[in-house]
Amino acid sequence: MATENPQTWALWLILSEMASDMQEDKKVAKILVLGPPKAGKTTLCTFLADFMEDGDTLKKGEDSGERERKFEFEFTSVYRPTKGVRIQEFETHEFFTEQEQNELGGTRRLEDSEIQLWDVSGDKKYEDCWPAIKENAEGVILVVNPEEHKGSDLQQWFYEFVEKENIDLSCVMVILNEQGAKKTNHEQISGFEILPKLRGVHHVAHHFGSEAMQVKMEVNSFMASVLKMDQRQMGSGVDHGLGYADEQEDDF
């Protein structure tokens, strides 16, 4: 690979080395968080990291809505684009509730294992790094802002990171990320056009400022489907995920 940007070249080398290390460690579930700029990908990853750090219980004296309200800052502050990729790591036992862990019993990495969320920049100038970012990925979360983006804005991300990498649709999730101080985008949500090839994928529309716990539950369910897919690939023969519709369309 050749690139005129030395910073991009250095990032590519680092990511390639990380991907190589992951091949030796089969206990890492790598999930890519993708989408156009200003979709809220970093907000999602930061939000999940906060829950992992603090746990699902409220801090002493914390109002029940405090955690949800503080994420409004992410939408109203100055936009800071991600440079290349940010990686959040979680232990599986930290990510899932006790009930979810029981439901996932028997998967090969329930204990002493990691989930990695790769928060990938929406800037196409990092495209040279995509091969290293893709390597060993097992799931994809596509994020869009329905006020700013269209379904077609996900087309290249879906093609490059899902279709070309043969990611099963049960391991793909689309989040319509409603931004702003309050939830008011019902018209944009209802009018958002889903790509034909993504109609078999689980779509959710959420507003972090008022629906934080629902977002966490949806992402947990998605992560469980990725781990269950891993178990099926090891020969369990159980199908818990979503799939393509009976009639697929050849083109977007």
Curated annotation (Swiss-Prot):
GTP binds at residues 35-42, 118-125. Keywords: Cell projection, Cilium, Cytoplasm, Cytoskeleton, GTP-binding, Nucleotide-binding. Disruption phenotype: Worms have an extended lifespan phenotype and are defective in dauer formation. SUPFAM superfamilies: P-loop containing nucleoside triphosphate hydrolases (SSF52540). One of its GO terms (cellular component) is axoneme. It is found in: Cytoplasm, Cytoskeleton, Cilium axoneme. Ciliated sensory neurons. One of its GO terms (biological process) is dauer larval development. Pfam families: Roc. GO terms for molecular function: GTP binding; GTPase activity. Component of the IFT complex B composed of at least che-2, che-13, dyf-1, dyf-3, dyf-6, dyf-11, dyf-13, ift-20, ift-74, ift-81, ifta-2, osm-1, osm-5 and osm-6. Belongs to the small GTPase superfamily. Rab family. Component of the intraflagellar transport (IFT) complex B required for transport of proteins in the motile cilium. May be required for ciliary entrance and transport of specific ciliary cargo proteins such as che-3 which are related to motility. Regulates specific signaling activities in the cilia, such as the daf-2/insulin receptor-like transduction pathway. This is Intraflagellar transport associated protein 2. It comes from Caenorhabditis elegans. The gene is ifta-2.
